[in-house]
Design a protein with these regions (language model features):
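N-terminal pre-triad scaffold of radical SAM enzymes
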Residues: 38-44, 62, 248-273, 300, ...
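Glycine-rich beta-alpha loop elements in corrinoid/cobalamin-binding modules
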Residues: 76-222, 459-510, 517-532
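A glycine-rich phosphate-binding loop feature that marks nucleotide/adenosyl-phosphate handling sites
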Residues: 194-205, 313-318, 342-348, 411, ...
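Radical SAM enzyme core and accessory elements
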Residues: 1-27, 38-40, 486-619
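Canonical Radical SAM [4Fe-4S] cluster-binding loop centered on the CxxxCxxC motif
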Residues: 52, 254-290, 597-618
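Conserved SAM/AdoMet-binding glycine-rich loop
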Residues: 40-41, 105, 114, 298-405, ...
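N-terminal [4Fe-4S]-dependent radical SAM core
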Residues: 7-39, 46-47, 204, 210, ...
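A short beta-strand-loop structural module common to alpha/beta enzyme folds
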Residues: 67-79
Length: 619
């Protein structure tokens, strides 16, 4: 039975299904019979959050413990947020409809820097005080994890616990400590000291940060005995020990990615110098084809989905991919399930691969060229040539494809306007290739879409040292790209440079940004990642009023020996390796994939030995 206030709110908003719960696959327990209650919060809309595979993994994992209950909460859209404030209806979870203050722990996933004000909005709607130092034992523990945890310093003061790395072992260990503390009456501080012993757990309150007079970080030091100077990320050494989820909560309102999805591998061997995920999730580990096939079949049967995505950073690098596709195609066509590989590589795309992924339904193909010239692709270590792009597109056109999306970035280190023109030239070559190919689909034209992101330098990558292009420079490059495209067969999409600027500020920011984020939220900034909601002028005025220069964080070079806000976080990649790759980038020198030869990045120490068996002649 809905609370009368909730019922009233639902009658006044668009898409009330975002807020009702009760979806197939939801897990319900008797709250009086569980020892730990965990609220998994996604700081964006229901449609975005329900597309997130990580939530599905941890939801099933935590709820597999009989005496723990993991529930879900999402950021309400503008209309529902206003109704909740008007009716004084606190933010609640989808399953029990209880307010977040009723939980032992409230966890946020940090997927995107521009979600930070949404985190504050959710805490505010829940009636939870923002700063960790102001919350005593009566409050839920506020937890964070996800890729942005690699430098969560701009929001570190809001969290009691930040998880670095992979959560499959971490989060259950945290819940076990919470359960123990409740039974033994342990204080919040002692509980945090106990949790700090869990691999990959960072307790921001146990570290002090000092600064040089010029604003750079001077030192980050522990302030409690036994706290490590550096926190090493948690890692799952053998993914086969954690089978993919075989049941999903099926959304009432269509999610952005509303399909069955299984993670076939984690990490990446490619070493693209711009790609933060490729460094954060090293080393690459894959699941066995037989395990994946069974999980996929069970997942589709349990959810009724008719599309299956084989997800990872680089699915076509899976060593048993063709074997897996053969296994999947034994049953998928009979069940009217289509297969999609969202992360295909130009350099290992094959006729056999395309045949095995188009037996039920064709869709457009997407490839990441990243840069418009070979020189710049070498700089960023994107080991792809035009010959490989040509071969791949020819295979696709022969198979009947008429739509190709090409991903690029602009604002890359050493980039010139010639490189921008190369983006348009590459797309035009693909159009020309289609019409030169006598086997292309008859009676249909080709559509090539250029999707161009603004490059944002990120921590733990070789490009963390480089300054980001200004918004004005990026806008000039975007204009030049549009002027360089002359075919109606080519469509150009690009990111807003001002939102990318703010992303860059938070990506490399420090703890002094926390008050700015709070003040910007109070001035009406939230849903910053949504173009229709982004208030750039409000952000800039807030920075100015608080005496903070945002360009200091993202538009100045970082010295190779500088202490960064994330220097105390160890993701397995050595500083020496990042410097070496940075210098190779400036010389336009490439580095081979690490499954062909070890490049001594340091990640092997996380596994306690070599990442790959090189005697197997891996490709």
């Amino acid at each position: 039975m809905f609370d009368p206030k909730l019922k009233e709110a639902l009658g006044r908003v668009q898409k009330p299904g975002r807020y009702t719960g009760g979806e197939p696959g939801s897990i319900y327990k008797e709250k009086d019979k569980v020892d730990v209650r965990f609220a998994f919060c996604f700081p964006d809309t229901y449609e975005v959050g329900m597309s997130f595979l990580g939530e599905k993994i941890l939801y099933e994992l935590l709820n597999s413990h009989e005496n723990w209950w993991c529930e879900r909460a999402f950021m309400p859209w503008l209309d529902m947020k206003a109704e909740m404030e008007r009716l004084q209806l606190p933010l609640y979870t989808m399953e029990s409809k209880d307010p977040l203050t009723a939980f032992d722990a409230v966890g946020f996933t940090l997927q995107y820097e521009l979600s930070y004000t949404n985190i504050l909005a959710m805490l505010d709607l829940a009636g939870i005080t923002f700063y960790s130092k102001d919350r005593d034992d009566r409050w839920p523990l506020i937890v964070a994890g996800g890729p942005c945890a690699c430098n969560a310093e701009p929001i570190a003061d809001f969290f009691d616990i930040i998880q670095l790395g992979e959560g499959e072992n971490q989060l259950p260990s945290i819940c076990a400590e919470i359960e123990k503390a409740k039974k033994e009456g342990i204080s919040k501080k002692q509980l945090l000291l106990n949790i700090a012993k869990i691999p990959g757990v960072y307790i921001p309150a146990f570290y002090d940060v000092t600064y040089h007079e010029d604003g750079r970080v001077k030192a980050i030091t522990p302030n409690e005995p036994g706290i490590p100077a550096r926190i090493t990320k948690a890692i799952i050494k053998d993914l086969n020990q954690f089978a993919p989820p075989t049941n999903f909560v099926v959304p009432m309102v269509g999610a952005i990615q509303d399909r069955a999805s299984i993670e076939v591998l984690r990490g990446c061997v490619r070493g693209c110098r711009f790609c933060q995920a490729g460094f954060l999730y090293r080393p690459m580990r894959q699941r066995d084809a037989s395990l994946l096939n069974k999980a996929a079949q069970d997942l589709c049967a349990n959810t009724g989905y008719e599309e299956l995505s084989l997800s990872s950073l680089s699915t076509s690098d899976h060593g048993q991919l063709e074997e897996l596709l053969d296994d999947l195609n034994e049953w998928a066509p009979k069940e009217h399930v289509s297969l999609s590989l969202p992360s295909l590589r130009v350099d290992n795309f094959s006729q056999s691969l395309i045949e095995k992924t188009t037996k039920v339904r064709k869709s457009g193909l997407t490839f990441a060229a990243e840069a418009g010239t070979q020189r710049l692709r070498n700089v960023i270590n994107k080991n792809v040539t035009w010959d490989e792009i040509e071969k791949t597109c020819t295979i696709a056109f022969n198979a009947g494809y008429t739509s190709v999306k090409l991903y690029f970035m602009m604002g890359l280190p050493t980039e010139t306007m010639e490189d921008i023109e190369g983006i348009a030239e590459t797309a035009q070559k693909v159009v020309d290739l289609y019409y030169k190919n006598t086997n292309h689909a008859k009676g249909r034209g080709v559509q090539v879409t250029i999707s161009c992101a603004c490059f944002v330098p990120k921590p733990h990558t070789p490009f963390q040292f480089v300054p980001m292009d200004t918004a004005e420079t990026l806008q000039a490059k975007q204009k030049h790209l549009l002027e360089s495209v002359h075919s109606r067969k080519i469509k150009v999409n690009y990111h807003d440079s001002t939102t990318s600027f703010l992303e860059g500020v938070f990506a490399k920011g420090d703890r002094r940004l926390a008050p700015v984020i709070v003040e910007a939220y109070k001035r009406g900034c939230y849903f910053d990642g949504w173009e229709e909601c982004f208030k750039y002028d409000t952000w800039m005025q807030t920075f100015a009023d608080m005496g903070i220069d945002p360009a200091f964080y993202c538009q100045r070079p970082i010295a190779l020996d500088e202490v960064t806000p994330w220097s105390h976080m160890d993701y397995g990649i050595t500083h020496e390796y990042l410097v070496r790759e940075y210098n190779k980038a400036l010389a336009a020198q490439t580095t081979p994939p690490c499954n062909r030869a070890c490049n001594a990045c340091g990640a092997n120490h996380l596994l306690g030995g070599p990442c790959f068996d090189y005697s197997q002649n891996l490709v």
